[in-house]
Amino acid sequence: LDSVYDAEILEPYEEMKKDKLLYAKSFYRQYCNTDPFSGKRLVEPYSDHLYVVQNPPAKPLTQQEMDDVYALPYMRAYHPSYEKDGGVPALGEIKYSLTSNRGCFGSCSFCALTFHEGRVVQTRSHESILAEARQMVQEKEFKGYIHDVGGPTADFRGPACKKQLTKGACPNRNCLFPEPCKNMVADHRDYVKLLRELKDIPGVKKVFIRSGIRFDYVLADKDQTFLLSLIHISEPT
């Protein structure tokens, strides 16, 4: 460990296996270090003087970096090795869906998205998303329906507040619970505009939202949300 600096030593693995409370404590300490601006290196001791070292999370991607990632020539198909097993049926639900963001400041207790993508929301530009949609329209299997436009939370199209871009997420409070933070920017106008632009593409019949929608965030915004619900969310059968 001589070369590992500014690290937080977690509970030893062998002890956590025997104590659920220690496991929960370790999980909480890991959760407190998921922010790229304040998170430390984490070290988990194992037997025989072995250690697992996790570096701090990477900084959020810029919009240009997000666009560059999604401009790569993805195949929208499963690997051919799955053919012998009949393919991947679940792919049909997401094949013609569009990722518009990553990250989530919802902080649901049951959810691990903060560990995967962080609390600072990163977004693609309209141009990047529209270009991908136009490519989908050209595919023979496309029937005119975009199944989803979203991410961890569909209606988050930017960081919760300006502070998150330079300081990261607040370590001791949530953006939406127990009540929305006064600094949170609740605004669906950009998202509604994006949905309209997608719907206007020749060959697109309907645009749906299947990613989760934060209703407390919707209620914090007094504009445009009715149109969002009326046009783009399937009615229950």
Where are the model-predicted features located?
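Short helix/loop capping segments that flank catalytic or ligand/cofactor-binding pockets
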Residues: 52-56, 62-64, 77-80, 107-110, ...
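Core AdoMet radical
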Residues: 115-222, 234
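Flexible, glycine/threonine-enriched loop-and-boundary segments that flank and lead into catalytic domains
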Residues: 78-95, 210-229
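Glycine- and acidic
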Residues: 50-52, 80-83, 93-98, 109-120, ...
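Flexible, acidic/Gly-rich N-terminal and inter-domain linker regions that tether
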Residues: 1-94
